[in-house]
Structures are given as C-alpha cells and as structure tokens.
C-alpha cells in the first residue's frame, strides 16, 4: 500500500508539469514530502535561513505554497530536513582512558587517592 502512495505521488508530481498546475493537500502532501525527503524527514514551515525575508512575510509554510498554490519538486525539497553528518569517532585520548584494564585503573586510583605523589609506580 505504501508503494501505491509513492507511485501516486510521483505520478501526481510528474503529471503536474505536463498537465498544468496541481496542488497537494493533506495526506497527498505528506506522502509527497515523505517520498522526496526520505529518511531525512521534513518541516511544515521552512527553517530559518531559507529564502528572503520578504518571502517569509508572504508564505507561512508548505500548505500555503503547495496546497493553496501549486508547487514543484524543488519547492518540496526546501522543506526537507538537512542531512545529518555522521557521528565522529571518539578521540584517542578518551579511548586510552576508558580502555585501560580494570586492575590498572584500581591501582592508579588507589595511588592518587592516598596522595602518593612521589615517583613510585605500582604495577600489577
């Protein structure tokens, strides 16, 4: 059933270019946004920074632009959420500290908690 909606959205969007202005409202608009944006998700109003300030005064959101008026794929894409950058790997410094074997951590903690500040190294 989901593929049916995607096909319907694609058909609606491609036929609108050939047949003239077409509007998307309600579930059709949501399905079209899901199709265009995919896993990124979407906004019903443009995030700050899109378009000029005069345009923001006239248009309140995607319903104004695509339901009350016709819109194209580029207009729909403007409401997609940005692509999230991949999470960076942990720093090497953090890995060294957290990857220390438990026995060495305990000895290290014991030495620092007793106030042993001399050049003595306790190893197991």
Curated annotation (Swiss-Prot):
One function term, GO molecular function aspect: insulin-like growth factor receptor binding
Biased composition (Polar residues): 110-124
Subcellular location: Secreted
InterPro entries with a match to the protein in the record: IGF-I, Insulin-like, Insulin-like_growth_factor, Insulin-like_sf, Insulin_CS, Insulin_family
Keyword annotations from UniProtKB, A to Z: Disulfide bond, Growth factor, Secreted
Region (D): 82-89
Function: The insulin-like growth factors, isolated from plasma, are structurally and functionally related to insulin but have a much higher growth-promoting activity. Acts as a ligand for IGF1R. Binds to the alpha subunit of IGF1R, leading to the activation of the intrinsic tyrosine kinase activity which autophosphorylates tyrosine residues in the beta subunit thus initiatiating a cascade of down-stream signaling events leading to activation of the PI3K-AKT/PKB and the Ras-MAPK pathways. Binds to integrins.
Protein name as it appears in the record: Insulin-like growth factor 1
Gene: IGF1
């Amino acid at each position: 059933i989901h593929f049916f909606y995607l096909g319907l959205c694609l058909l609606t969007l491609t036929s609108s270019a050939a047949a003239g202005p077409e509007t998307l409202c309600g579930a059709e608009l949501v399905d079209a946004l899901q199709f265009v944006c995919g896993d990124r998700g979407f906004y019903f109003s443009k995030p700050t920074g899109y378009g000029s300030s005069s345009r923001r005064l006239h248009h309140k959101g995607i319903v104004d632009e695509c339901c009350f008026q016709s819109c194209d794929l580029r207009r729909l894409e403007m409401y997609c959420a940005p692509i999230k950058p991949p999470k960076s790997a942990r720093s090497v410094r953090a890995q060294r500290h957290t990857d220390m074997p438990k026995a060495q951590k305990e000895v290290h903690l014991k030495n620092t908690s007793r106030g042993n500040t001399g050049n003595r190294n306790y190893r197991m």
